[in-house]
Amino acid sequence: MLKQVEIFTDGSCLGNPGPGGYGAILRYRGREKTFSAGYTRTTNNRMELMAAIVALEALKEHCEVILSTDSQYVRQGITQWIHSWKKRGWKTADKKPVKNVDLWQRLDAALGQHQIKWEWVKGHAGHPENERCDELARAAAMNPTLEDTGYQVEV
């Protein structure tokens, strides 16, 4: 039987682009582990993706995961858009490169070994774990120490 794990995520950006951070909580059998990091220049969508990626990559074996995010971008990307992007060689319907492709590919790889149920929660609406992730993400964004090497300035 697969271990049942809950993951809660959030990303934050002070300016978009600007300094950003992510926060994630991984819960298994009542125990929690938190993750957060801040980047000097990034976007909110990249930080939303990073939160999910880092938490999933921390899992050491196949798990049944309920992943809660307040990001429609992440939820729709993974449940609706990614299959078409992959078929088209990571291009959008209008044949443009998928934005944040480095992180989408990393998330896709992290998902491969787990059974995932995606849940959307309304941000800033009092959901306790989402609020905690938001606090982690904002604190990391206010004290960025990393460079987001995959971030590309849009022309």
Curated annotation (Swiss-Prot):
Q: What InterPro entries does UniProt report for this protein, alphabetically?
A: RNase_H (IPR050092), RNaseH-like_sf (IPR012337), RNaseH_domain (IPR002156), RNaseH_sf (IPR036397), RNaseHI (IPR022892)
Q: Where is the RNase H type-1 domain?
A: 1-142
Q: Which positions are annotated as binding Mg(2+) 1? A: D10, E48, D70
Q: Which SUPFAM superfamilies match?
A: Ribonuclease H-like
Reactions catalysed according to its record: Endonucleolytic cleavage to 5'-phosphomonoester
Residues noted as binding Mg(2+) 2 in the record, renumbered to the chain: D10, D134
Subunit organization: Monomer.
Show the Gene3D superfamilies listed in the entry: Ribonuclease H-like superfamily/Ribonuclease H (3.30.420.10)
- Where would you find this protein in the cell? Cytoplasm
Family, similarity comment: Belongs to the RNase H family.
Q: What cofactor is needed? A: Mg(2+)
Q: Does the keyword Secreted apply?
A: no
Q: Is this entry keyworded Metal-binding?
A: yes
UniProt protein name: Ribonuclease H
What is the annotated role of this protein in its UniProt record? Endonuclease that specifically degrades the RNA of RNA-DNA hybrids.
A Pfam family reported for this protein in Swiss-Prot or TrEMBL: RNase_H
The record's principal subcellular location, in a coarse class, is cytoplasm
Q: GO biological process: what's one of them? A: DNA replication, removal of RNA primer
The UniProt entry, under PANTHER family, shows: RIBONUCLEASE H1
The taxonomic lineage of its organism, from the top, reads:
Bacteria, Pseudomonadati, Pseudomonadota, Gammaproteobacteria, Enterobacterales
What the record notes about the co-factor is: Binds 1 Mg(2+) ion per subunit. May bind a second metal ion at a regulatory site, or after substrate binding.
Q: Which GO terms describe its cellular component?
A: cytoplasm
Write down the EC number: 3.1.26.4
GO MF annotation: an example? nucleic acid binding
